[in-house]
Amino acid sequence: MSSSMLNFTASRIVSLPLLSSPPSRVHLPLCFFSPISLTQRFSAKLTFSSQATTMGEVVDAGMDAVQRRLMFEDECILVDENDKVVGHESKYNCHLMEKIESENLLHRAFSVFLFNSKYELLLQQRSATKVTFPLVWTNTCCSHPLYRESELIDENCLGVRNAAQRKLLDELGIPAEDLPVDQFIPLSRILYKAPSDGKWGEHELDYLLFIIRDVNLDPNPDEVAEVKYMNRDDLKELLRKADAEEEGVKLSPWFRLVVDNFLFKWWDHVEKGSLKDAADMKTIHKL
């Protein structure tokens, strides 16, 4: 191995501290449910560094360190257009438009819509360091179930619910005990594709999860720039600003699709306590 490669590998090990990462963020093929020795962890880091070099990640040196780590640690669930699991791939590859277009990579995702007891919807503005759609306003939490046993459970959408509980803690600091998985109500699924810029984008089969809870928030600045509860009129004003391009307001494409096609009629069910009557998990809406 050349000295330059050794220096690059060492720099990756220093900048991406896998040994200190929480267990939930260590995803190693075939063995991530077994104890991992220090030797195995070190070997995994070398492999990780090699993969990053192969994929040309050097050109992304300006990417935020936290987001870069998640891009390679997180393994998304690949599905076909009928939501059948067909494999897994790094978050990095799943969001490269080149890969999306050339290999038709489609991954499973979820979007949480959390309402408080006043039936106000919690929105977040994505952080400036997000790789896709930075600083756009969107629903409460948008992310991906990972290719791990607990988040691959299809029965009653349990895998996706588990993932939603995990990410609401990670992004908004909401403890798991405040968001019981059985309180998430899956309403439907959408399939969409949306470029973010010339390099990155989304191609997702997205589960839409609603929940009504009063919660305490402690947003993670690596993920979230701002949070705000909105009633219907507040949201309509936000939509108006986005349409008029006022104050730099932008909305995520998946949130706008849900707003335009479903949200306000589902909001009626939120207020009536009849959300389960609106559920249709048999249909995948191609938007």
From Swiss-Prot:
Name the UniProt record assigns to this protein: Isopentenyl-diphosphate Delta-isomerase I
Gene3D superfamilies per UniProt: Nucleoside Triphosphate Pyrophosphohydrolase
Transmembrane parts of this sequence: none
Pathways involved: Isoprenoid biosynthesis; dimethylallyl diphosphate biosynthesis; dimethylallyl diphosphate from isopentenyl diphosphate: step 1/1; Porphyrin-containing compound metabolism; chlorophyll biosynthesis
GO cellular component, one term: cytoplasm
Lineage start: Eukaryota, Viridiplantae, Streptophyta, Embryophyta, Tracheophyta
Source organism of the structure: Clarkia breweri
Keywords assigned by UniProt, alphabetized: Chlorophyll biosynthesis, Isomerase, Isoprene biosynthesis, Photosynthesis
Domain of life: Eukaryota
Summary of the function given for this chain in its UniProt record: Catalyzes the 1,3-allylic rearrangement of the homoallylic substrate isopentenyl (IPP) to its highly electrophilic allylic isomer, dimethylallyl diphosphate (DMAPP).
GO biological process: chlorophyll biosynthetic process; dimethylallyl diphosphate biosynthetic process; isopentenyl diphosphate biosynthetic process; photosynthesis
Database matches in Pfam families: NUDIX (PF00293)
